[in-house]
């Protein structure tokens, strides 16, 4: 089976012996190019984030060493990072300078003498003077920027600034010594070259990678004792430590020596270990070291002034073996873990499911189960890990089960509630177990018609000392019970007291449990009287109360409770509440008799009030998996209350194919056995397919909290569970309730739980719940005897695992939706418009293109995808909102003709709208049809349409047309929710879902958890230990979310549970959409995802249309006046000096940024094709800087001729005469930064492709699709049209749609005030905040508007809109949201209150408009409220 890109990368890590880590999550090899002639292998890698420098150096070194004998290795990294990390920028600096190709030793020296800083979004490099600044700018910055980008850093520019602190004397001295310095530098350069040659020779002579274990320095005597790191508290001359390497870095210093930095832990603490290389042998040893190794280190402990921590300066470092846990059981007697939590158990477990599967396979276990809390989000990873490690995966979940309704009454009897006598009783006990604890006070009141007629109150001597906890909770002391009556005597007296009355209690099942267990102990029968539980009675009658504790209810219903947790007071209070509740039940529900109460036990969302208990549910079959998905979905969507809940009736309904286990100490069987004994447990156990018992340490919290007295009682309970299983013929399996892999990982879970202050798990010490081997598990159950222990640990789990079919949680192919007649409809839409545009019969060039595309689209089942997009676009256009396309959909003429995109991919051509005459240009005469000169039809004289962007279909669906189309559509942000909801109309509400995401603990969050734990536990941890602990908490599920645009479409012949469970994002039950439970990346190859994006451009176009009445489609794509703004602002009636810009493109999409405006200034585009080039160049990587920019500057080619978009490569090469398939392959390689194989380069040369073209291709790392650029440019030109011809309407739309930050006072005061405000921001330089930088962009447009002769007005209480700017003559009236500190909600409130009636005063505005005093003051100071008095005034007439 072929490997995917991620699996290929994992294989690479294995080959170079690089341990995996979170830095390599989802890492992939995008492409590997092998140059056979030059023996160069080019790796193109994709990581989520820029690698930490230590990891990068390790990875690079291991890669070089691994392939040293095969080829020279180069690599390029692409990451998902969008922001520069200043720390990483600085850490990489020396390496970047050394490897950026800077040839001048002087320039290298200047770079090495400084390190850039990253402040407020800018990378700054200080220079002592202008000379150095020019050296850096002209010779260093471009290569440095490109090299950073090659390592995955986001695209950025380095800005040089003069260091004002440099003295004038130093500057003068520099000029005087320039000649001398140049000579010295030349000599230094010569020496450097010589040294570099020597180094290369030295490296060539360097020893091969080491074969044996790492040994740096001398051998350390294995018998020499190692000191625990936690015991190292001060500097020491010599110390030996032994530990696990969890992080490392190798730095190459300016001296060319290497510095090894290890982070090592022995799990008592962690320390940083440093060592400098002495020779090439040391460097080879450095390269052989890797995270995951165990090492012994001897060195001195010193305070590191830079790290401000104790570090070990190593003399010797020896790789050492470490005895990891083994499973020594025979192969056919290995256990199977049936209860295990991965890091997808929200904030409760630490290891990935892959970690567990790998360990289980290493131990030889035949299978392993996954049972995360309430979810299945680890299933896709578990499936992949199972296949990789050849181990059977049992897919399960630990569910929060609830009874659908808890009985209100017990021992139903047809007795009149009004006329009955009630005995309301309460007990005080020594604990919660009716088996192991005792009643120490029994009190009751007898009531008739709400009046107390008798009392019963007795202490009971339990025969043992009361614990401090019991006394604190009940206020009962030893003295109070000592010498009291016995339990048997008091229980007999109480039976006489209650007689035939109705027995009542609050949470009465607890008290009845103690009473009936006591009666059984004394050979008396249980209570058979009718019973009422006021707790469930209150929950039924009053389902929306926040709490149902006795004291809470007493306060709510004004019933006096003198001393809560004393039995007599609790009993009397319960009696009065019972009287009130039964009267209410009669009035509201006509309940008259005791046996009517339980008719209502399932009402008012009773599942919300039932106490959840745990059960483990496993999918034994594929049908069972679907049922499990359904159950998980229902628990998250319909029965969510604080946690996802599974009503017993839901499990009963969908139990087919599901195995049910009794779970952990929170399961109902174990709880019953612990609290009420074997007979109660027997009643519960019959529901389960197997019973679970767990190692004694897993129950430690029960002993600590007093629920179980001691270990002896715990062993008795576990033994009783096993006996019960034997008696009922129910299998009993020993399970681990695993939450982490190894014992030392316990601390990570502890930190996670500590980060949740309200988590009840914080009340006790966390138990030992690591993944246990067969040996460890047998030892934990040895108290059962050898035979029984083997049965529950080995035999039963293996037998259960054998009952499972091989289940697949992820499909193996794509399932697209069906729409009846989609193929015929797409074909008809295409052909109808084709004939309307080009006539019938079609021109051969059109017919061939249409036939080719329809064959691919229909033949591969893609018609429905096209039709979905067509329906969405059609509806949006019909509703008045244009849709912009993203990606390569504009490469398809079928998409164009069916109305999905406005981009026409045919070669440039004329077509007559009247007689359908057409003429195509197929020899690259024009880059874009929009650039054709106006021309009348030679047949009928009609002005012809000019169209065609010359884009090959292959860029969309691949060379063979079988690639699944990815149609991304840009809808107006205002219209996006409507477009999303329209998919429900198209497919039905049960067939569309938002694409789900999973939010996990990130590095910084984990660091914060550790620091909080350190603070709250009064510890002082070394920085290395903080790093280790933070690493252990990362990747754990925190929450869930949804993709902002992705809609998942389920085909009508399947349902969502065939693919994934569903839920609400972040468990928000008020959310409008349900999401996939699986992260959408897990199922993206199995089910269709449509990206319906929200974008400002369509919103702005709609507003421009509404204000002007001009239909956007009627705007010519290329207007001569509009095109002038790309070269000069003069067409706007302003000069460069007035608006501080050499172009008129401020505020124009795609062309308004400083970077792109700089490109415009250099290239002066005048055609649509050249604008396409600019768009492609600005979005690509290594396409403009150091590439096309230089080709244009030195006159090699023009803007129109450089490679701008990916599609140009294929069409250009075909034009040169190359075969279309090779042209396509070269385009694909180049656009992804994979280079060009030598044989293809030769083919290009044979076709007379210029050298500059080939060299340009080789530099490119990423290229923009031409169709995407064309759609963006078309939208931008429409916006620009309004800026030129309808200026005030344009500015209204811009400030309403695109601007969020305003300086309203400056704008209202005119251009001088605006310019002053702009200067105040620019003067701050790097110190300007992000908000100020955003404001500067808005002020640039405000200044331009003012310079064009228009004005701004302060908000107008009577006219202003809440959010949009309004036109009033030549003035724009500000909306209320433009007032500093006035949010949109308040703005809407002001407008709503104004519509109701005019404001009478400032007081009235404050009250009805919800306007704060500070906002009132602002408006008053700026003349907005000049006509309003301060307060309302009464009129006498």
UniProtKB/Swiss-Prot annotation:
Q: Which Gene3D superfamilies match?
A: 1.10.150.870, 3.30.1900.20, 6.10.140.1510, Metal-dependent hydrolases (3.20.20.140), Nucleic acid-binding proteins (2.40.50.140), PolC, middle finger domain (1.10.150.700), Ribonuclease H-like superfamily/Ribonuclease H (3.30.420.10)
Pfam family of this protein, just one? HHH_6
Write the record's keywords in alphabetical order, separated by commas.
Cytoplasm, DNA replication, DNA-directed DNA polymerase, Exonuclease, Hydrolase, Nuclease, Nucleotidyltransferase, Transferase
Q: Where is this region: Disordered?
A: 196-219
UniProt-listed GO biological process terms: DNA-templated DNA replication
Principal location class = cytoplasm
Catalyzed reaction equations: DNA(n) + a 2'-deoxyribonucleoside 5'-triphosphate = DNA(n+1) + diphosphate
Q: What Enzyme Commission number does this protein have? A: 2.7.7.7
- Give every Exonuclease domain span: 422-578
**Where in the cell does this protein reside?**
Cytoplasm
For this chain, one GO molecular function annotation is:
3'-5' exonuclease activity
Q: What class of enzyme is it?
A: transferase
An example GO CC term for this entry is: cytoplasm
InterPro entries, sorted: DNA_pol3_alpha_NTPase_dom, DNA_pol3_finger, DNA_PolC-like_N_II, DNA_PolC-type_N_I, DnaE2/DnaE/PolC, DNAPol_HHH, DnaQ, Exonuclease_RNaseT/DNA_pol3
Q: Which SMART domains match?
A: EXOIII, POLIIIAc
What PANTHER family does the database record attribute to this sequence? DNA POLYMERASE III POLC-TYPE, DNA POLYMERASE III SUBUNIT ALPHA
Membership in a protein family: Belongs to the DNA polymerase type-C family. PolC subfamily.
The protein's role, per its UniProt record: Required for replicative DNA synthesis. This DNA polymerase also exhibits 3' to 5' exonuclease activity.
Name-wise, this protein is DNA polymerase III PolC-type
This chain is encoded by the gene named polC
């Amino acid at each position: 089976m072929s490997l995917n890109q991620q699996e290929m990368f994992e294989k690479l890590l294995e080959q170079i012996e690089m341990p995996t880590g979170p830095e390599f999550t989802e890492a992939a090899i995008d492409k590997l190019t092998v140059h056979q002639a030059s023996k160069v292998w080019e790796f193109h890698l994709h990581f989520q984030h820029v690698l930490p420098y230590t990891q990068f150096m390790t990875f690079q070194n291991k890669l070089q060493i691994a392939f040293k004998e095969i080829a020279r290795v180069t690599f390029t990294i692409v990451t998902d990072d969008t922001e520069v990390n200043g720390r990483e920028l600085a850490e990489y600096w020396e390496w970047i300078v050394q490897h950026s190709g800077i040839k001048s030793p002087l320039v290298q020296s200047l770079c090495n003498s400084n390190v850039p800083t990253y402040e407020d979004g800018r990378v700054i490099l200080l220079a002592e003077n202008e000379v150095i600044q020019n050296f850096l700018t002209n010779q260093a910055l471009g290569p440095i920027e490109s090299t950073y980008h090659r390592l995955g850093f986001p695209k950025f520019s380095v800005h040089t600034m003069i260091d004002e602190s440099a003295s004038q004397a130093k500057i003068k001295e520099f000029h005087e010594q320039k000649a001398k310095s140049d000579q010295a530098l030349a000599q230094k350069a010569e020496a450097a070259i010589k040294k570099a040659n020597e180094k290369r020779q030295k490296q060539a002579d360097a020893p091969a990678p080491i074969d044996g274990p790492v040994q740096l320095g001398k051998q350390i005597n294995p018998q020499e004792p190692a000191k625990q790191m936690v015991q190292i508290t001060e500097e020491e001359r010599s110390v030996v430590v032994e530990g696990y390497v969890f992080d490392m870095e190798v730095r190459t210093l300016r001296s060319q020596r290497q510095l090894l930095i290890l982070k090592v832990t022995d799990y008592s603490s962690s320390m940083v270990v440093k060592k400098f290389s002495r020779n090439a042998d040391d460097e080879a040893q450095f390269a052989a070291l890797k995270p995951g190794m165990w090492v012994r280190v001897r060195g001195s402990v010193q305070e590191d002034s830079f790290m401000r921590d104790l570090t070990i300066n190593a003399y010797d470092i020896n790789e050492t073996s470490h005895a990891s846990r083994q499973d020594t059981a025979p192969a056919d007697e290995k256990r199977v873990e049936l209860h295990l939590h991965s890091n997808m158990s929200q904030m409760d477990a630490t290891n990935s499911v892959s970690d567990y599967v790998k360990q289980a396979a290493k131990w030889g276990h035949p299978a392993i189960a996954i049972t995360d809390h309430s979810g299945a989000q680890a299933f896709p990873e578990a499936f992949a890990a199972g296949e990789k490690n050849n181990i059977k995966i049992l897919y399960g979940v630990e569910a929060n089960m609830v009874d659908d309704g808890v009985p209100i009454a017990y021992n139903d009897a047809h007795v009149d509630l009004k006329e009955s006598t009630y005995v309301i009783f309460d007990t005080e006990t020594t604990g919660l177990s009716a088996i192991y604890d005792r009643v120490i006070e029994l009190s009751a009141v007898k009531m008739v018609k709400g009046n107390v007629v008798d009392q019963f109150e007795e202490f009971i001597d339990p025969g043992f000392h009361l614990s401090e906890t019991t006394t604190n909770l009940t206020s009962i002391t030893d003295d109070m019970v000592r010498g009291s009556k016995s339990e048997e005597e008091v229980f007999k007296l109480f039976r006489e007291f209650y007689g035939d009355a109705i027995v009542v209690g609050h949470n009465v099942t607890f008290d009845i449990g103690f009473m009936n267990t006591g009666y059984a102990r004394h050979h008396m029968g249980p209570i058979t009287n009718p019973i009422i539980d006021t707790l469930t009675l209150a929950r039924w009658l009053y389902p929306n109360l926040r709490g149902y504790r006795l004291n809470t209810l007493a306060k709510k219903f004004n019933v006096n409770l003198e001393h809560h947790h004393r039995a007599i007071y609790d009993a009397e209070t319960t009696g009065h509440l019972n009287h009130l509740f039964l009267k209410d039940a009669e009035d509201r529900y006509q309940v008259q008799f005791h046996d009517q109460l339980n008719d209502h036990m399932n009402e008012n969302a009773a599942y919300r009030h039932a106490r959840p208990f745990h059960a483990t549910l496993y999918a034994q079959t594929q049908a069972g998996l679907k049922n499990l998905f359904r159950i998980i979905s229902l628990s998250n969507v319909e029965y969510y209350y604080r946690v996802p809940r599974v009503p017993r009736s839901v499990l009963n309904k969908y139990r087919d194919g599901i195995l049910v286990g009794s779970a952990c100490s929170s399961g109902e069987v174990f709880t019953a056995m612990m609290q009420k004994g074997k007979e109660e447990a027997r009643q519960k156990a019959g529901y389960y397919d197997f019973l679970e018992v767990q190692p004694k340490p897993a129950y430690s919290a029960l002993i600590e909290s007093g629920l179980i007295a001691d270990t002896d009682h715990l062993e008795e309970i576990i033994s009783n569970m096993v006996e019960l299983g034997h008696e009922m013929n129910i299998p009993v399996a020993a399970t681990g309730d695993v939450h982490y892999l190894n014992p030392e990982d316990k601390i990570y879970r502890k930190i996670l739980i500590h980060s949740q202050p309200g988590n009840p798990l914080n009340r006790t010490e966390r138990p030992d719940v690591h993944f246990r081997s067969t040996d460890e598990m047998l030892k934990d159950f040895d108290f059962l005897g050898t035979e029984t222990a083997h049965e529950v640990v080995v035999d039963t789990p293996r037998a259960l695992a054998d009952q499972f079919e091989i289940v697949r949680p992820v499909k193996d192919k794509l399932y697209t939706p069906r729409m009846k007649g989609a193929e015929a409809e797409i074909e008809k839409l295409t052909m109808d418009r084709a004939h309307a545009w080009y006539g019938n019969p079609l021109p051969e060039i059109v017919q061939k293109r249409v036939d080719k595309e329809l064959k691919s689209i229909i033949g591969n089942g893609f018609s429905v995808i096209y039709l979905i997009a067509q329906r969405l676009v059609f509806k949006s256009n019909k509703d008045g909102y244009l849709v912009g396309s993203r990606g390569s959909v504009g490469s398809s003429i079928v998409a164009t003709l069916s109305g999905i995109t406005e981009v026409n991919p045919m070669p440039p051509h004329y077509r007559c709208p009247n007689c359908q005459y057409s003429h195509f240009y197929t020899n690259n005469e024009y880059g874009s049809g929009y650039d054709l000169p106006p021309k009348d039809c030679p047949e009928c004289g009609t002005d012809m349409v000019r169209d065609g962007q010359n884009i090959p279909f292959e860029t969309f669906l691949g060379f063979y047309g079988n690639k699944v189309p990815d149609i991304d559509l840009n809808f107006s942000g205002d219209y996006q929710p409507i477009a999303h909801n329209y998919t429900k109309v198209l497919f039905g509400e049960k067939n569309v879902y938002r694409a789900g995401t999973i939010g996990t603990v990130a590095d910084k969050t984990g660091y914060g958890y550790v620091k909080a734990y350190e603070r709250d536990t009064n510890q002082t941890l070394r920085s290395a230990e903080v790093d280790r602990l933070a690493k252990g908490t990362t990747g754990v599920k925190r929450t869930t979310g949804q993709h902002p645009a992705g809609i998942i479409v389920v085909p009508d012949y399947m349902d969502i549970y065939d693919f994934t469970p569903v839920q609400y994002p972040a468990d928000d039950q008020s959310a409008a959409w349900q999401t996939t439970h699986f992260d959408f990346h897990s199922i993206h190859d199995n089910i269709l995802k449509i990206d319906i994006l929200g974008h400002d451009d369509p919103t702005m176009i709609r507003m421009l249309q509404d204000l002007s009445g001009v239909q956007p489609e009627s705007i010519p794509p290329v207007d001569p006046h509009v095109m002038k703004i790309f070269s000069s602002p003069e067409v706007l009636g302003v000069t460069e000096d007035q608006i501080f810009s050499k172009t008129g493109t401020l505020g124009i999409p795609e062309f308004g940024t400083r970077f792109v405006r700089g490109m415009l200034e250099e290239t002066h585009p005048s055609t649509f094709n050249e604008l396409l080039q600019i768009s492609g160049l600005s979005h690509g990587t290594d396409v403009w800087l150091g590439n096309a920019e230089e080709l244009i500057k030195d006159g090699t080619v023009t803007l129109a001729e450089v490679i701008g978009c990916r599609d140009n490569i294929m069409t250009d090469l075909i034009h040169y005469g190359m075969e279309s398939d090779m042209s396509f392959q070269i385009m694909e390689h180049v656009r992804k930064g994979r280079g060009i194989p030598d044989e293809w380069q030769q083919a290009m040369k044979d076709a007379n492709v210029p050298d500059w073209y080939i060299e340009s291709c080789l530099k490119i790392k990423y290229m923009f699709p031409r169709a995407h650029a064309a759609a963006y440019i078309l939208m931008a030109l429409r916006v620009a049209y309004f800026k030129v011809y309808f200026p005030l309407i344009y500015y209204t739309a811009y400030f309403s749609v695109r601007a969020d930050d305003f300086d309203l006072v400056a704008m209202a005061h005119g251009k001088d005030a605006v310019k002053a405000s702009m200067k105040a921001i620019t003067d701050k330089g790097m110190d300007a905040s992000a908000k100020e930088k955003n404001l500067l962009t808005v002020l640039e447009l405000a200044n331009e508007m003012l310079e064009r002769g228009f004005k701004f007005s302060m908000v107008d209480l009577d006219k202003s809109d809440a959010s949009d700017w309004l036109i009033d003559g030549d003035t724009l009236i500000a909306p209320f949201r433009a007032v500093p500190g006035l949010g949109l909600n308040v703005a809407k409130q002001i407008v709503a209150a104004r519509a109701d009636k005019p404001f009478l005063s400032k007081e009235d505005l404050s009250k009805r408009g919800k306007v704060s005093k500070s906002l009132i003051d602002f408006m008053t100071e700026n003349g907005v409220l000049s006509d309003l008095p301060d307060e309302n005034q009464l009129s006498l007439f």
